[in-house]
């Protein structure tokens, strides 16, 4: 920890640097060194004899049943007891005020998962279970940035991240992108030609490297390595936001069908592009993961992985802010993951990949059929849930040229909604929406009924012909 402090203490925000442990957590860490039985009057927790929840049962598919459509469910039950059996979950402890880091059994499962998939290349790393992805990002921001700081972001990025950053008083510095993610040369140009009138050079980069929201781009391995090299050169902390990491897909093929071979864990892992966390050798990546796209959003659970200094500071904040994540949610999640095991969880993730690959392919097939190539430009996403369509502004009808790109895009969006089709307009994904210089629309293929894909894109095309020379 001392080495980490020397290396990264200067990255802590004023708020984070001044954070202390929660007072009751501090008391809990003080243990007696005698053999006298402790009679504790310290805790103000409610008496568990008055907990109206006596038992929790969770039903979910058995490993393999989702592939064979057998609908075979497993049911796991936990009962309230002062004496949990060895190896089982302590439901009483889960329902009481909990450990801020998370239920120990779930923490261990996730740490084992991180070790198996990402294999961090330095020793002093840890995780913190979060109340979902959004608060995970909030933790990272409060850890690192002060009011007035500049933060590096992709030119188009997750709107909730932008909304979370604005009240913190940060300035957005966009990095240009293409279909393979952020451009290292754009990053380097920003850093080398930094305008000191904006304040100190940025020391934080926020990125969604895989299946990026909204562009669907996936940062190539070569670029991932390059960005880590640049991060060391310019002393940058990278916040790696990865809710779509496990939704990686095969190259687009309209005739693609899922592989019916037995699940092979080695093959599954080899197909995953190495994460920034894996490539990081000195602890400058904070990775934010979520169960929302992998299990269900309503559990509001995720986790952060990073060096132990950063995780310790995040935990101090959580102790007096969100406290522990929901005990009930953690019990439900642990019941599923413990039953499946590490390999079963990965097998489930492969099934998710297959499901979303089929949906992506269906939307691309409809796009190839209905979107006019003279105006619409898009690429096949390699991961995630989104198709990002650019409309060629050079083919706008002249009567629209007296308006800004943002105004034209919004006008088209309103017309699309009136005509019964609703993508999302590109400017909502920008730190400064009024600076839009291109027209984009994002189509999500995760939820819409497959039978509506063609009709939706037909409506899109019939609407934009009012604005463009097709």
Curated annotation (Swiss-Prot):
It is an enzyme of class 2 (transferase). GO terms for biological process: aromatic amino acid family catabolic process; lysine biosynthetic process via aminoadipic acid; tyrosine biosynthetic process. GO terms for molecular function: 2-aminoadipate transaminase activity; aromatic-amino-acid transaminase activity; pyridoxal phosphate binding. It catalyses: an aromatic L-alpha-amino acid + 2-oxoglutarate = an aromatic oxo-acid + L-glutamate. It holds the Pfam family Aminotran_1_2. Keywords: Aminotransferase, Cytoplasm, Pyridoxal phosphate, Transferase. Disulfide bonds: none annotated. Its main location: cytoplasm. GO terms for cellular component: cytosol; nucleus. InterPro entries: Aminotransferase_I/II_large, Class-I_PLP-dep_aminotransf, PyrdxlP-dep_Trfase, PyrdxlP-dep_Trfase_major. Its cofactor is pyridoxal 5'-phosphate. The keyword Cytoplasm applies. It is found in: Cytoplasm. SUPFAM superfamilies: PLP-dependent transferases (SSF53383). Its EC number is 2.6.1.57. Belongs to the class-I pyridoxal-phosphate-dependent aminotransferase family. Has aromatic amino acid transaminase activity. PANTHER family: AMINOTRANSFERASE, AROMATIC_AMINOADIPATE AMINOTRANSFERASE 1. This is Aromatic amino acid aminotransferase C569.07.
